[in-house]
C-alpha cells in the first residue's frame, strides 16, 4: 500500500467515527426527550440539524475516493460544526442567565415550518423553552455537552484539513 491509500483509509476511519458519534448524540437526545421527558427547544432542534448535517457529510465523505471531494465535505462539516458551536454557546448563555430568552415566539414557527419537522415531527418539532434548565449530566448542562461535541468535531476536522492540505495540489 502506498502513502495515498493509507492516508485515505485513515481519513475514512475518522469520518466514519464522526458519523457514528453524531448518530449516538442524536439517539441520546431522543432518549432524553422520550424517556426523561426533556422537551427540546428551538435551539436544541437547530443543534440536532447541525449534528444531522455533520453525520450526513461525514458518511458521504467516507465513501469518496478522491481528496478534493473529501476536502469539500470536510469543509462543510467544519462549517456545520462552527454553526453548532455558535448555537450551543448561545443556548448555554441563555440557560446560565435566567433573564435571557431565545425568542421562542419568533424561533419556534420558523423551526417548526422546516420540512424535516413535517417529515419527522418526533425528532424536529419544538416542544420546550430554551430557558428550561434540565438536570446536568456529570455537572455539565446539555448545551454544554453539545458545545463540547461540536468543538471536538470542529477541531478534529480542521486539523484533518490542515494535515492534508498539500494533497489537493499534488
Curated annotation (Swiss-Prot):
One of the record's GO molecular function terms: protein-disulfide reductase activity
Matching Pfam families: DsbB (PF02600)
Residue intervals passing through the bilayer: 15-31, 50-64, 72-89, 145-163
Cystine residue pairs: 41-44, 102-130
InterPro entries given in the database record: DiS_bond_form_DsbB/BdbC, Disulphide_bond_form_DsbB, DsbB, DsbB-like_sf
Signal sequence residues: none
Periplasmic face of the membrane: 32-49, 90-144
Membrane topology: Multi-pass membrane protein
Keyword Metal-binding: no
BP terms from Gene Ontology: protein folding
Cellular localization per UniProt: Cell inner membrane
Gene Ontology cellular component terms for the protein in this record: plasma membrane
Key words of the record: Cell inner membrane, Cell membrane, Chaperone, Disulfide bond, Electron transport, Membrane, Oxidoreductase, Redox-active center, Transmembrane, Transmembrane helix, Transport
Cytoplasmic side: 1-14, 65-71, 164-170
PANTHER family in the record: DISULFIDE BOND FORMATION PROTEIN B
Function: Required for disulfide bond formation in some periplasmic proteins. Acts by oxidizing the DsbA protein.
Family, as annotated: Belongs to the DsbB family.
Protein name from the UniProt record: Disulfide bond formation protein B 1
Upper classification of the organism: Bacteria, Pseudomonadati, Pseudomonadota, Betaproteobacteria, Burkholderiales
Gene behind the chain: dsbB1
Amino acid at each position: 500500500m502506498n502513502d495515498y491509500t493509507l492516508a485515505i483509509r485513515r481519513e475514512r476511519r475518522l469520518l466514519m467515527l464522526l458519523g457514528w458519534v453524531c448518530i449516538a448524540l442524536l439517539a441520546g437526545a431522543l432518549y432524553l426527550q422520550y424517556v426523561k421527558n426533556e422537551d427540546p427547544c428551538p435551539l436544541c432542534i437547530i443543534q440536532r440539524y447541525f449534528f444531522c448535517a455533520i453525520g450526513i457529510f461525514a458518511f458521504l465523505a467516507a465513501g469518496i475516493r478522491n481528496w478534493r471531494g473529501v476536502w469539500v465535505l470536510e469543509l462543510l462539516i467544519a462549517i456545520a460544526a462552527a454553526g453548532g458551536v455558535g448555537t450551543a454557546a448561545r443556548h448555554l448563555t441563555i440557560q446560565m442567565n435566567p433573564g435571557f430568552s431565545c425568542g421562542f415566539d419568533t424561533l419556534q414557527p420558523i423551526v417548526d415550518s422546516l420540512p424535516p419537522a413535517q417529515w419527522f415531527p418526533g425528532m424536529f418539532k419544538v416542544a420546550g423553552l430554551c430557558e428550561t434548565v434540565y438536570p446536568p449530566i456529570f455537572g455539565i448542562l446539555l448545551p454544554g455537552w453539545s458545545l463540547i461535541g461540536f468543538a471536538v468535531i470542529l477541531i478534529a476536522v480542521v486539523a484533518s484539513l490542515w494535515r492534508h492540505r498539500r494533497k489537493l495540489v499534488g
